[in-house]
Amino acid sequence: MQEQYRPEEIESKVQLHWDEKRTFEVTEDESKEKYYCLSMLPYPSGRLHMGHVRNYTIGDVVARYQRMLGKNVLQPIGWDAFGLPAEGAAVKNNTAPAPWTYDNIAYMKNQLKTLGFGYDWSREIATCTPEYYRWEQKFFTELYKKGLVYKKTSAVNWCPNDQTVLANEQVIDGCCWRCDTKVERKEIPQWFIKITAYADELLRDLDKLDHWPDTVKTMQRNWIGRSEGVEITFDVKGYDNTLTVYTTRPDTFMGATYLAVAAGHPLAQKAAANNAELAAFIDECRNTKVAEAEMATMEKKGVDTGFKATHPLTGEEIPVWAANFVLMEYGTGAVMAVPGHDQRDYEFASKYGLTIKPVILAADGSEPDLSEQALTEKGVLFNSGEFDGLAFEAAFNAIADKLAEKGVGERKVNYRLRDWGVSRQRYWGAPIPMVTLEDGTVLPTPEDQLPVILPEDVVMDGITSPIKADPEWAKTTVNGMPALRETDTFDTFMESSWYYARYTCPQYQEGMLDSKAANYWLPVDIYIGGIEHAIMHLLYFRFFHKLMRDAGMVTSDEPAKKLLCQGMVLADAFYYVGENGERNWVSPVDAIVERDEKGRIVKAKDAAGHELVYTGMSKMSKSKNNGIDPQVMVERYGADTVRLFMMFASPADMTLEWQESGVEGANRFIKRVWKLVYEHTAKGPVAALNVDALSEDQKALRRDVHKTIAKVTDDVGRRQTFNTAIAAIMELMNKLAKAPQEGEQDRALLQEALQAVVRMLNPFTPHVCFTLWQELGGEGDIDNAPWPVADEQAMVENTTLVVVQVNGKVRGKITVAVDATEEQVRERAGQEHLVAKYLDGVTVCKVIYVPGKLLNLVVG
């Protein structure tokens, strides 16, 4: 064994061994308990960042630990390879998205291998290949035949710069999340999947997810947004149709003083024909933000349509306004307004001088003061005719019943969740497998024409999708008739909604999934990824699993038993102000810093001498130029050091602060383990451990070893507090380094301890542990070695600490045998000099003894 720890030599050698032996390739094995460990697949952006490294290190630690427990562990990896960034990069680099993507995959695959992740590379998937998306296309046509897919014209967020539709979540402050262009509203025909048909089950089954973070479950509950209420129909004078509204507060119905409709509502359109002010307002609303969070904060505006609706219970005429806070695609595109008891309605009514009628009493039973704001709490009704005096629940039921009796209302369950719009007007995505005949008939692409292959050899102009720009591409024939293919492509969330299932049978050619393999591996035992995916990806992921279950492909109801959301990686951020007042962000690697005695940064400059402003720790990002390249760190310290730091610096679900001093500390620790193994093995062969022959000191050390095994097993396995597991191993290493190594049993004990330490560290630092296991004469490869098991006998304490008091005051502590009698404890206490001086020349009148804990001597 060489004396110096040289990671660059060890790591490449061990990685080559794993590759040649195909160590992490697995197949179904009914005789073994399976464990499916999955990290969210990366987008091949070109380089791994520290967020990736953290995510995949956590996954690899879990997978390697479960493997050492003797389980059949599947840990696959792939590439979420479609998406808009590839189009931008292709235009910029004068290439096509496909070669750019495949080059990035090759580069990043190499980076993953350098970090020593134990993936089953035989199952690698790239979602942009026809071998993958063909099954998604086929499944979509089957969902269409089942009535779960439909096309409708819908208002979308349109980014005029990217020429594409944005999801509500991609609109930030009314602008495109990617290019910051002002977003417009546009009506276009789009394909939708009926996720609302599964809303109740998606909500209900959250209760089955005992090992998902509550924050994620709460976000999904709110996103699905189930509510119970009443749908009410209003007659409108001079308008051919009725208006329908939905309310969760029918108890306030007698206080409804106006209705509001969306600018795109047919009633508003009709009124605008001879109302120039309204027509201009409708035009302005075309650029209204559609994200709900934005809707809440924007200024509420409206125009009176001139139409009057009849209140179905009072018969009063109430005005109908067009308002910018009502959206056509939410509910019916019309709402009833109760300004006395809804703050938004109150602000709008106050602004435009509309009637505000209170119908709910304040908590103290008095009429509410509505001079400054609405009373939104539930309470007892007044000013409501026959319903006066009723509290919320009774009023809800009485008014709902009355409306139903009159044929103008019915109870309804509503959801905030909208159907999933899967059409994207971009090129680099899977083509949607639908065709339109010359007579306008829309059909799914026939199975013998699947997959609809996306041409990869294209020229990007950065504006129009190449498959939209080429009229020939869309032409096809169906049943002998000319037809045009759909030129929209799928939302990339489609690919990431089912990849986890395809990993179980990536080479399967007979269909989307091989049920036998899928049902052996699924559900995923642990899924690791960022909390930013809580409502989009993680909801579609659950939805797709239920679709596949209902198609008979899988038997489980949910895709993943446990979800671990890792925290973000933060780093120091610095900038200097340029000549034009702009901020120039400087990488923390290039910042020369001065610190105070507490280690806080007080001054910084860069190599060019610019005084730098330190903004503290923030998420690693391109915009602040504070990302640390994992590759540079691996080259400097080795993959094992980077991995160990990642797992030690912070609990997995908390933010991690990148500190190079911490990385150096992790590196020093690995060197200490190496040095101790080197010194130990250099002394030659080791005798067998004879537990019965150990001295008290040796037994105490062995007790520490086995207590550490027990703690680390619990921390890594049950609690998943990996940082405390590493801390416990470090503490044990300190004791082992100080332990005597002279006697035969000293060395035998150290051999047992080091073999345990190396196996416990193996999930974290697999390369160095692979090597040290061989040097310690471990059996076979460490990858197939069992996790160490704590010896219960070794952990039994044979001594205990007894506190000695004289007249109730603590005067000393003594170590005695666990089975010592009261006499022996008293005798031992008398020999303790700190205690003895208080007993000199006095009489002990009374002895209070709590066995194994406390001895109190009362003296006179």
UniProtKB/Swiss-Prot annotation:
Location, primary (coarse class): cytoplasm
Biological process per Gene Ontology, one example term: leucyl-tRNA aminoacylation
InterPro entries for this protein: aa-tRNA-synth_I_CS (IPR001412), aa-tRNA-synth_Ia (IPR002300), Leu-tRNA-ligase (IPR002302), Leu_tRNA-synth_edit (IPR025709), M/V/L/I-tRNA-synth_anticd-bd (IPR013155), Methionyl/Leucyl_tRNA_Synth (IPR015413), Rossmann-like_a/b/a_fold (IPR014729), tRNAsynth_Ia_anticodon-bd (IPR009080)
Motif ('HIGH' region): 42-52
Record-stated family: Belongs to the class-I aminoacyl-tRNA synthetase family.
Gene Ontology MF annotations: aminoacyl-tRNA deacylase activity; ATP binding; leucine-tRNA ligase activity
Binding site for ATP: 622
Location relative to the cell: Cytoplasm
Superkingdom of this protein's organism: Bacteria
A cellular component term, taken from the record's GO annotations: cytosol
E.C. designation(s): 6.1.1.4
Transport is among the record's keywords: no
Protein's name in the database: Leucine--tRNA ligase
Keyword terms of this UniProt record: Aminoacyl-tRNA synthetase, ATP-binding, Cytoplasm, Ligase, Nucleotide-binding, Protein biosynthesis
UniProt entry tagged with the keyword Ligase: yes
Annotated motif 'KMSKS' region, positions: 619-623
Reactions listed under catalytic activity: tRNA(Leu) + L-leucine + ATP = L-leucyl-tRNA(Leu) + AMP + diphosphate
